[in-house]
Amino acid sequence: MPRHQNYSLSDEAAVQLVFRKYGVKVSAEQIAKAYAPEQKMSWKKSVEVARFIEGMTLRQAKSWLEDVVKMKRPIPIRTFKKKQAHHATPWSGWPVAKWPVKVARRFLDLLENLENNARFRGLDVERVVIVHAAAHKGYRIHNIMPRAFGRATRFDEQTVNVEVIAAELPQQVVPKRYRLNLVKR
């Protein structure tokens, strides 16, 4: 049983978030959520992917992450970029990028779950926009690696709790194509 099952945003907070970001009032029935607890993947890469897909439509996020899995398009790295290689990227102004394939696969599964939840609630999937995506550290799995001469080295495996919240927005507010917001903060 997962230890952390709570979303960081309640339905009321998600409604307020949609109003602040898009200036549109939606009801709690127009919001779909998906949660993936204790995934064995990199927390740093998960934060970057979650930050990147926020603001995209469900279709845009799925197509971009499928291209990441195929190693066609990268994810821009904003925070955890020390000593990272600079790549030829499809955008200008942000040369640090990675192809986190394992994280992209897990996010694709989560987005599939989100799409099914949206369909179950009766939402139009073409107008569903990701308004919140977050990756939080989960608990550590303690392991021991046997070494030579009777020694043992302890190492921990990090888990990640990922949540995605989407809302059905009016057609005039839904982004037609995704513009990369790569301005340095």
UniProtKB/Swiss-Prot annotation:
Record has DNA-binding as a keyword: no
GO molecular function terms noted in the UniProt entry: rRNA binding; structural constituent of ribosome
Keywords: Ribonucleoprotein, Ribosomal protein, RNA-binding, rRNA-binding
Protein name stated in the entry: Large ribosomal subunit protein uL22
Assembly behavior: Part of the 50S ribosomal subunit.
GO biological process: cytoplasmic translation
InterPro entries: Ribosomal_uL22, Ribosomal_uL22_euk/arc, Ribosomal_uL22_sf
Top-rank taxon: Archaea
Protein's job: This protein binds specifically to 23S rRNA. It makes multiple contacts with different domains of the 23S rRNA in the assembled 50S subunit and ribosome.
A Pfam family per the record: Ribosomal_L22
Tagged with keyword Ribosomal protein: yes
Entry's Gene Ontology cellular component terms: cytosolic large ribosomal subunit
Record-stated family: Belongs to the universal ribosomal protein uL22 family.
